[in-house]
């Protein structure tokens, strides 16, 4: 049985350790100094790959390839629970991640970077909680509030990093996460726009939900790679265009993440870390009402 610590009377600043979850081109271990691989077992199975621990400018970081370093795990088959639990288990306090997205808005052009603030979950097959009633899991049922969906302070750090580096980035967006691996139909794409979606991808959910349930401060940098298929007169999204646009812009995301690591390390996050854990505890029912 896993126990979750809800109370902490320690008044000293809590140390930070930053998990970085990346897709193709953003799982390069060379961004870490003094790196070493660590295989972690979790109550929820194996993560997508071994964790790579190291430092970025003296700050402890952990790198995980969301789809495996061979990129052979499709979005539906990513073990999101094992990934998040493994990063939590090695002491991460923050998660900063990258994701490739289609744009549902004319003003978010292919190649643009976006720091999203909310999501719409259209997945159908993915486990969304650690509190599943099994013996090895935390006790109770967690009804986690998902507003705000992302850590606002972590989002602001990412935006500050982009500004300092003079890399344009849209400061908010709602991501629609679909099950995949197929792309949307045109009718679906139009529907998501009508719902208020700005971006569409296949990985934010349940990753962002599980990160919050694990008490981690989660922020994301999205690369808009295409216009999905809602624009009339356009052929729509295809894998080759996605990969090309992602590769052309991945260095900008790396620069933002590295800059953000330094910014996070300079600040005291004790209150945010404790509040994130307390949010989980306050919304977990462990007995009969």
Curated annotation (Swiss-Prot):
InterPro entries: MTAP, Nucleoside_phosphorylase_d, Nucleoside_phosphorylase_sf, Purine_phosphorylase-2_CS. Phosphate binds at residues 24, 66-67, 99-100, 203. In embryos, expressed in the fat body and visceral mesoderm. Pathway: Amino-acid biosynthesis; L-methionine biosynthesis via salvage pathway; S-methyl-5-thio-alpha-D-ribose 1-phosphate from S-methyl-5'-thioadenosine (phosphorylase route): step 1/1. One of its GO terms (molecular function) is S-methyl-5-thioadenosine phosphorylase activity. Disruption phenotype: No visible auditory phenotype. It comes from the Eukaryota. Its EC number is 2.4.2.28. Keywords: Cytoplasm, Glycosyltransferase, Nucleus, Purine salvage, Transferase. Substrate binds at residues 202, 226-228. One of its GO terms (cellular component) is nucleus. The record marks 184, 239 as: Important for substrate specificity. It is found in: Cytoplasm; Nucleus. It is an enzyme of class 2 (transferase). CDD domains: MTAP_SsMTAPII_like_MTIP. It catalyses: S-methyl-5'-thioadenosine + phosphate = 5-(methylsulfanyl)-alpha-D-ribose 1-phosphate + adenine. One of its GO terms (biological process) is L-methionine salvage from methylthioadenosine. It holds the Pfam family PNP_UDP_1. HAMAP family: MTAP. PANTHER family: S-METHYL-5'-THIOADENOSINE PHOSPHORYLASE. Belongs to the PNP/MTAP phosphorylase family. MTAP subfamily. Catalyzes the reversible phosphorylation of S-methyl-5'-thioadenosine (MTA) to adenine and 5-methylthioribose-1-phosphate. Involved in the breakdown of MTA, a major by-product of polyamine biosynthesis. Responsible for the first step in the methionine salvage pathway after MTA has been generated from S-adenosylmethionine. Has broad substrate specificity with 6-aminopurine nucleosides as preferred substrates. Homotrimer. This is S-methyl-5'-thioadenosine phosphorylase. It comes from Drosophila melanogaster. The lineage of its organism: Eukaryota, Metazoa, Ecdysozoa, Arthropoda, Hexapoda.
